[in-house]
Each structure stands twice: as structure tokens, then as C-alpha cells.
């Protein structure tokens, strides 16, 4: 990822396999989710090291081919829940063949890399132009029940407000999301108590807002989707000026 996103304003984690037990010891009421490196020559050894730590979920990022997914699913061999981070145009264009591999428990659409893969300027363009809708249709048709997309900032923040993004998860039937760096940028917030406060209050606010989204009618969700598309167009237009 460091090579792929060298000049991007993005999160590049420095975690290692040795960090997994440390996280497990600190987490009491949540699943342990580990993202591996993409398939490479030493992938098998890396994955075995990850699985030895007994995570609940293992995610494969930045794959482009059916063969890579086959390698991943076969190597995990039922020892953890499998998650695919779909973030390349190559993978998106052959999603039916990828899903047909079987053994895939969940798929997350990574809008950051995917937007760059398609030559877009703003990561939520794929949400506005129907790309995410088309992928979700394929997930549903092929029996993938657990899926999600993008990142969510705290309420009241983000270039594209979280208040517009969260209803899209409900419209599309998404049941998972990743908190964006804008939710809590730990490179700028160094105090652990402050980080804890941000997460506690921020997640609680999102949960409360989710209740409102769950009660929205189809018309209200559709109207929000239209407003989101218009807002994305405005953002992209401003980027081009």
C-alpha cells in the first residue's frame, strides 16, 4: 500500500502480525478483523502467521483476478471468516466470476483505490454514478449477504457529509462500513483519553442517526440519494476548477 499510495493523503498502517495478540487482549466485545497484504510471493507464510493468532475475520485487499481470490479462499480453508476488499476496476469488471469462487463470507467496496482505478478525482463518485449499485445487485444475485462500502466520518464532518452517506447504506442494504480517518485522525490526536472520547461519542451519535435512517421511507432514501449525487457533482466540479 505504501508503494501504491505513495503520494496520496491516505492511511498507511504500520501494524504487524505481532500486534494481533495485543489487540485481542484489549478487545472484549468485538471481533478481531485482520487485513493481510495483497497476494505476493510470501503470502502463504504471512497468512499462516495471521491465522495462528486466531482472528475472527481475515480480509484480502487489492486483488485483480479470480486466481488471487481462489488462492486466498483455499489458503484460509475455513479457519476464519473471509472478507474481500474490492478496490480495483479489474475486480469490479469480473465480479460474477469472482463471486462464483465460493467461500466468500463478505465483501467491502473500497472506494478510495477503486476511484483511482477508474481515474476518478473523488472517492464517492462510484457511489454517485451507479457503480456501487451495480456491484450490490451482483452481490445480492449471487447470495452475498454481508457487504458494505466506503468510509464514514463523524456526523457533521466530511467533504461529503456522513448524514448523506449513512442513508445510502440503508438504501443499498449494506450492513458494514469502515470509519474514515476524518472520524479520528490519530496523527493529530495523541492523547489516548481524547481518542477514546472521540470514538465513544462519535459512534454513539452515528448509532442514534442510524435509527432515523432505518425509519426512512423508500422515497426519503431516494431523495437523499439524489441529493448526494448532486453534492458529489458539485465537489468534483470544484476540484476541476
Model-predicted segments: where are they?
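Expand to "…catalyze enediolate/carbanion chemistry for C-C bond making/breaking, isomerization
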Residues: 1-241
